[in-house]
Amino acid sequence: MNFIYTLQELISALENCSNEEYPTVLKNLQLPYNELTPYESWKSKGYTRNCIVRTSKYELVLLCWNVNDATPIHDHDGQKCWVYQVKGSISEKRFDFKNENLVETLCTNLSPGKLTYMDDKMGFHVLVNNSNDRATTLHLYMNPIDFCSYFCEEEKVFKKKTLQYDTVTAQKEVTL
């Protein structure tokens, strides 16, 4: 498989492969930052979730992170999740729930071009922009994800949350 340099090439590859081939497609991903800038949106506080494409098979979401933005510790409602670091640096911490406590099992930093994978069998994770600049990450979910469970720090329990987008790109705008 050839390297993938554009968003249109990525979408075409995802549309024309089986779900089992997603890891191979993503390992060939070399998207430059400017490919995704049209899909960015920012707010003064907190990260944004920007839907680029959503089909019955998958969903591509661009997350835009301000300095110190972080997700809560969360799962993916049984879906598989790949995170491709587009710009900046994000740290990922993974957790297992043991003896009614969350235990950190891994901490890694993602730099541009790096890819990470997560599913619920691996536990839970949190993503944090602990760099000194904004960051963007491209998330591929197989299948689309509508809910997740997140860890409520105040109550020390997991709660279910409906996921929302800050922006949605009409699929017809992404030309194949």
Predicted regions and their residues:
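N-terminal leader/capping segments at the start of a protein or of a new domain
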Residues: M1-L36
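A short glycine-rich, His/Asp/Glu-containing loop-to-beta-strand
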Residues: P38, W42-V67
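Conserved short histidine dyad/triad with adjacent acidic residue
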Residues: L62-H76, D120-M122
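Glycine- and acidic-residue-biased ligand/ion/polar-headgroup-sensing regions
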Residues: V67, G78-K93
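A short hydrophobic beta-strand segment most commonly corresponding to one strand
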Residues: W82, D133-F147
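Short acidic-glycine-tyrosine-enriched beta hairpin
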Residues: F97-H125, L163
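Asparagine-centered strand-capping/turn motif at beta-strand->loop junctions
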Residues: L127-S131
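Acidic/histidine-enriched, glycine/proline-rich intrinsically disordered or flexible terminal extensions
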Residues: K156-L176
